[in-house]
Amino acid sequence: MALLKSFIDVGSDSHFPIQNLPYGVFKPESNSTPRPAVAIGDLVLDLSAISEAGLFDGLILKDADCFLQPNLNKFLAMGRPAWKEARSTLQRILSSNEPILRDNDVLRRKSFHQMSKVEMIVPMVIGDYTDFFASMHHAKNCGLMFRGPENAINPNWFRLPIAYHGRASSIVISGTDIIRPRGQGHPQGNSEPYFGPSKKLDFELEMAAVVGPGNELGKPIDVNNAADHIFGLLLMNDWSARDIQAWEYVPLGPFLGKSFGTTISPWIVTLDALEPFGCQAPKQDPPPLPYLAEKESVNYDISLEVQLKPSGRDDSCVITKSNFQNLYWTITQQLAHHTVNGCNLRPGDLLGTGTISGPEPDSYGCLLELTWNGQKPLSLNGTTQTFLEDGDQVTFSGVCKGDGYNVGFGTCTGKIVPSPP
């Protein structure tokens, strides 16, 4: 089959060819109304302009106003038939042999914007955010550090996707500075706890699923139908203050050590775009209980990378590489488990995967693991470092390598700035 091509010039190394078309929300000017968009090459396609021109002419979307909203929530709520229709329409009107947009100079000028000149914002209203703990390698490494080899992974971990409820209000878009959090820490021994800026600030390499239609209160989602409730994935950095977290987490789990900031990438890559990169998820032993047993257990071959640009330096260092395949619990199992007690999910809710660590030290997904809680400093082109310092910039990237094209997520970037005096 010939590779689908667009009339938009897209470089071979671009994350955003016509095979991808990820969704986001942008503002052409800082004071303009937000509008939904898809990315293609170096351009942003304004979906409100496409909608107003009547180009969404399918049965579901022809009279819909979902792309005239300032966020994606209404579109997310419409479900997979609408998502598939939108994708089909967009691929058709952007294809190289379709004149309806290609040859309409007025509409092209109205619809396309240079990505480098627009402001991207959080693309949906996030009512709730839950963070899972789905990588076995990450769970094992944390257990080895804090509990020892005898109890590295708690028995319940292999039985259910562990999670905690995060703070939706502090989720920010890529490029937003992160203020070093303040809180209580506790030194070794019997010393009194201290209060002040975190001394062990860390990143966590994660991805997150964006919830689509969701479910009514009291009506769980079957694990084999869960994919129809996941619109797509994005990159996520769940910034973590390890010293605050270690002192506070017993007995109820993370609080101030996590709630100060979570960064997401601006573009949501749909499950339809990821479908060619689906792969078998790890075999689960013991077998999951029936409500978590999937007919097909799918992960995705998404290569992930973290770059650290130390404060005052012009160069960045690649400090780890991992892959979405390293998740033990699938995103569909995570969603099904979340709802099995009757909990209702809503359009735009965010489900984080937890840190995606691989089996080898160069694939660990956070500094806690990479430096083994500060005991093994990281080498950075002639200098060493344990945790994040003020001025450090962390950038995630993720991409699927296709045959002649990429399906990528762009980047997820944040810089650490000092705590206020």
Swiss-Prot record:
Annotated organism of origin: Arabidopsis thaliana (Mouse-ear cress)
Keyword set includes Ribonucleoprotein: no
List of residues binding substrate: 147, 245, 249, 355
GO BP terms, alphabetized: cell death; homogentisate catabolic process; L-phenylalanine catabolic process; tyrosine catabolic process
Superkingdom, taxonomy of origin: Eukaryota
Cellular compartments per GO CC: cytosol; extracellular region
E.C. number: 3.7.1.2
Gene3D superfamilies according to UniProt: Fumarylacetoacetase, N-terminal domain, Fumarylacetoacetase-like, C-terminal domain
Cofactor(s) listed in the protein's UniProt record: Ca(2+); Mg(2+)
Null mutant phenotype: Spontaneous cell death phenotype under short-day conditions.
GO molecular function: fumarylacetoacetase activity; metal ion binding
Family: Belongs to the FAH family.
Binding residues annotated for Ca(2+), in chain numbering: 131, 204, 206, 238
Protein name (record): Fumarylacetoacetase
